[in-house]
Curated annotation (Swiss-Prot):
GO terms for biological process: maturation of SSU-rRNA. Residues 140-169 have a biased composition (Acidic residues). The gene is rbfA. One of several proteins that assist in the late maturation steps of the functional core of the 30S ribosomal subunit. Associates with free 30S ribosomal subunits (but not with 30S subunits that are part of 70S ribosomes or polysomes). Required for efficient processing of 16S rRNA. May interact with the 5'-terminal helix region of 16S rRNA. Residues 128-139 have a biased composition (Basic and acidic residues). It comes from Arthrobacter sp. (strain FB24). The keyword Cytoplasm applies. This is Ribosome-binding factor A.
């Protein structure tokens, strides 16, 4: 097993080598619009997965996948010449889903922004169901309010026989 840091460095080198080889060595017109986005190498340095994107419809993407499979031998040979490992890793090409995920995310954000604008428009013309401030009191601030239930002033109002020994009714 190789060091994970070494595998990461090798993956970056393979990414660069494959991208350059696609531009210089491979003359397939199906591979002209390919962008290599990432590469990953297993810790034993035997297998490399290369992620790519192609802008276009499904037909263009399918053609690019076929072109990469056809050029896999040439690309592996170029990788073997430009890296310093005993065994050249096998190459696997995987279409990267980042552009698809990004466009889906942008569509969701657009829909959320539209809903927020609709809610804001409805809220602008809405009225409160009750008072604007339900905790607002009509009693002036300088008037003292007797907030407790029972105190000494209230004892004078009640007959002594109605109270028990604790002063309760």
């Amino acid at each position: 097993m190789a060091d994970p840091a070494r595998a990461a460095k090798l993956a970056q080198r393979i990414k660069v080598v494959v991208a350059e080889a696609l531009g210089r060595k491979v003359k397939d017109p199906r591979l002209e619009g390919i962008t290599v986005t990432d590469a990953r190498v297993t810790n034993d340095l035997q297998h490399a997965t290369i992620y790519y994107t192609v802008f276009g419809d499904q037909v263009v993407q399918a053609d690019a996948a076929k072109g990469l499979e056809k050029a896999k031998g040439v690309l592996r040979q170029e990788v073997g010449r430009n890296i310093t490992v005993r065994l050249t890793p096998t190459l696997e090409f995987v279409a990267d889903q980042i552009p698809v995920n990004a466009s889906n995310l942008e569509e969701l954000l657009r829909a959320a922004k539209k809903r927020d604008a609709e809610v804001a428009a409805l809220a602008a013309g809405a009225k409160h169901a009750g008072d604007a401030d339900p905790y607002k009191s009509d009693i002036p601030e300088d008037v003292e309010i007797d907030e407790d239930d029972f105190d000494e002033e209230d004892e004078d109002l009640i007959d002594d026989e109605e109270l028990d020994e604790d002063g309760n009714k």
